[in-house]
């Protein structure tokens, strides 16, 4: 009917779509698309180039690359490799000198922004890992040996390239951070479960640049993040892996955006 016709007409605005401009600005850097690479630990598990490959890809497509504290390459390696926009994902450590060192190295290496993860103070009960048999350090089982046999290229690259380690913190523990040391062990040994708002504010001030709080799930926390000087927030993307009884992060977007989206 006539009402439906007018309503449908409103849907299809007469906008030029010949060459759409997808660019936007984040942390003072213009990027070519409203998408960037989120930090991901241990990227060499799926490709021998690890973070190097991700940084190159982000640079190629004109967007942010984000580095995890638990990356397999160093801050300096990535800085020398890519001139594109870069973000570092930080955790508050029990030993504050480790936290300070990571912040200082990022500043010297020209990183554009920093985010502090606040929803992984302890390791989650990763049920999928139990089902698939994934462990660090790896356990040689019939299933894993079969998987290695089915992926000879991965095995070959693992054998000929440098050994796995958490490159940015490899010298910070007596036991080291090679593949023989569980990532979960490092989290439990080094991450500070007593982290609070004062710790977050300390990191914001020490970085003294574009800073995001990563892992926010409530309007109250979003407002508090702005109050302590954060320039952005990241709604939790860990979801049920960390706390399976929580709401979906997607369901929190509108309320948080309405509360602090213009700040």
Language-model features, listed with the residues they occupy:
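Hydrophobic faces of well-ordered beta-strands that scaffold small-molecule active sites
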Residues: 35-38, 63-67, 86-90, 114, ...
């Amino acid at each position: 009917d006539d009402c439906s016709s007018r309503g449908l007409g409103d849907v299809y605005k007469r906008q030029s779509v010949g060459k759409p401009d997808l660019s936007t600005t984040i942390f003072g850097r213009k990027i070519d698309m409203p998408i960037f690479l989120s930090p991901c630990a241990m990227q060499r598990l799926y490709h021998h180039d690890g973070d190097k490959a991700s940084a190159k890809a982000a640079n190629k497509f004109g967007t942010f690359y984000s580095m995890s504290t638990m990356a397999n390459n160093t801050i300096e390696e990535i800085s020398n490799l890519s001139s594109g926009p870069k973000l570092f994902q930080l955790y508050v450590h029990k030993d504050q000198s480790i936290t300070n060192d990571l912040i200082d190295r990022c500043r010297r290496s020209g990183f554009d922004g920093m985010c502090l993860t606040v929803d992984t103070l302890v390791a989650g009960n990763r049920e999928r890992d139990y089902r698939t048999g994934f462990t660090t350090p790896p356990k040689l089982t019939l299933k894993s040996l079969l998987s290695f046999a089915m992926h000879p290229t991965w095995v070959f690259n693992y054998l000929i390239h440098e050994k796995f380690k958490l490159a940015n913190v490899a010298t910070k523990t007596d036991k080291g951070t090679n593949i023989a040391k569980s990532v979960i062990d490092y989290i439990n040994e080094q991450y500070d479960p007593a982290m609070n708002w004062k710790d977050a504010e300390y990191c914001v001030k020490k970085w003294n640049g574009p800073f995001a709080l990563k892992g926010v799930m409530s309007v109250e926390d979003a407002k508090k993040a702005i109050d302590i000087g954060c320039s952005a927030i990241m709604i939790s993307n860990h979801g049920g892996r960390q706390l399976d009884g929580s709401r979906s992060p997607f369901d929190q977007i509108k309320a948080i955006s309405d509360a602090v989206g213009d700040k």
